[in-house]
Regions:
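Conserved N-proximal alpha/beta basic substrate-recognition cap immediately N-terminal to
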Residues: 2-122, 268
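Short acidic-glycine loop/turn motifs at beta-strand connectors
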Residues: 144, 191-195, 226-228, 288-290
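C-terminal active-site "lid" helix and adjoining low-complexity regulatory extension at the edge
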Residues: 13, 242-266, 273-280, 287-335
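Short, surface-exposed beta-strand-loop junctions and turns on beta-sheet-rich folds
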Residues: 134, 205, 300-302
Length: 335
């Protein structure tokens, strides 16, 4: 499935209901908003969620044209992260093996029932995940008791193409922010010709109810100062609700200092050079009491989190990568 198809496969009925709510808030008719969506789609290739999340109904044409949508991601990532090398990242067991020095936890992808039983004995709390997936779908936290017999779990893994990994015990300071989920930092890097740099970083925090911090699974995001490792401003969820403090813990976001930030930066800058063909990666970094670890690497990271938090389009991120590629390869890629 192409990303553009993915963007527009959403529920049109739900989009219409969302427009009805927005109509009252903005004082515009549903017809006016929908025709505006069609205009924005023609100009940018945006999907339903893009239109709402980025408040396209409020943007000038100049502002609109700076937003990265699914359309731009498809084009850009074929240059910066070609599909020919995707399984290095997208098949999650491959990722765990390829970046084993950075993941900091046990995982089980293949073996015998007896080996699975031994794994479960060593890991009384596990995460069960699909071999591939987007936006945190299909991820579940499970105790040893909930997992049932090793034989039954083994058969389920084989049938549904699942793998399991040991649950990450997160750093005490991060746990203070939200203990219901493992809260991660999304760091996008550009690795090219033996050099790497950080393009942006933001924190993702669970809502205190779900076991997942993903923006698409009820989590929220907060801007992060790359130099200091401090959060700044407010947190925002996908419904654009704003939070000065975490709704469950009451901890203030602005000024919250991440532990092991320098170590985290070094880790992702090193990891960015592991595969010389994949230049742009969105790393999900967790913190334990011993330091940072990689949860996963996304070969084609989305722009929704950074653009919602920035409240503006971020084509500048893509342009900075294309400038380096053009200079080195004599190409003339433009966005």
């Amino acid at each position: 499935m192409g990303l553009l198809t993915y963007a527009l496969q959403g529920n049109l009925g739900k989009f219409h209901r969302d427009l009805k709510v927005l109509s009252k808030k903005e004082g515009r008719s549903v017809f006016s908003l929908f025709t505006n969506f069609l205009y924005c789609f023609a100009k940018t290739g945006c999907g339903y969620s893009d239109y709402l999340n980025y408040k396209f109904y409020k943007r000038t044409k100049k502002e609109l044209m700076e937003y990265v949508t699914i359309k731009h991601q498809e084009w850009f990532y074929e240059i910066a992260s070609p599909s020919a090398y995707k399984t290095f990242f997208t098949v999650k067991p491959n990722f765990m093996k390829n970046f084993s020095q950075y993941v900091g936890r046990e995982f089980f992808t293949e073996g015998t029932v007896e080996e699975l039983e031994a794994f479960l004995e060593r890991n009384p709390l596990i995460m069960i995940k699909p071999y591939d997936g987007l936006a945190g779908h299909g991820v579940a936290k499970m105790t040893r008791e909930e997992a049932g017999s090793a034989q039954a779990l083994y058969e389920k893994m084989q049938k549904e193409h699942l793998f399991i990994e040991g649950y990450v015990k997160q750093n005490a300071e991060i746990n203070r922010l939200c203990s219901a989920s493992v809260n991660t930092i999304r760091i996008m890097t550009f690795g090219y010709k033996g050099k790497s740099r950080i393009l942006y970083a933001a924190m993702r925090i669970g809502n205190g109810v779900n076991h997942c911090d993903n923006f698409h699974q009820g989590g929220m995001g907060c801007s992060l100062d790359i130099e200091t490792g401090k959060l700044y401003g407010i947190a925002i969820d996908k419904d654009l609700n704003e939070f000065e403090v975490h709704p469950s813990s009451g901890v203030k976001f602005d000024g919250f200092q991440l532990p092991y930030w320098e170590e985290a930066k070094k880790m992702v800058l090193d990891a960015a050079l592991v595969n010389e063909h994949i230049h742009v990666v969105g790393w999900d970094v967790a913190f334990t009491d011993e330091g940072p670890i990689l949860i996963e690497g996304n070969r084609r990271p989305g722009y929704d989190l950074v653009q919602v938090l920035s409240d503006c389009g971020r084509k500048d991120i893509m342009r900075s990568c294309l400038e380096d590629i053009n200079a080195a390869e004599g190409t003339n890629y433009k966005l």
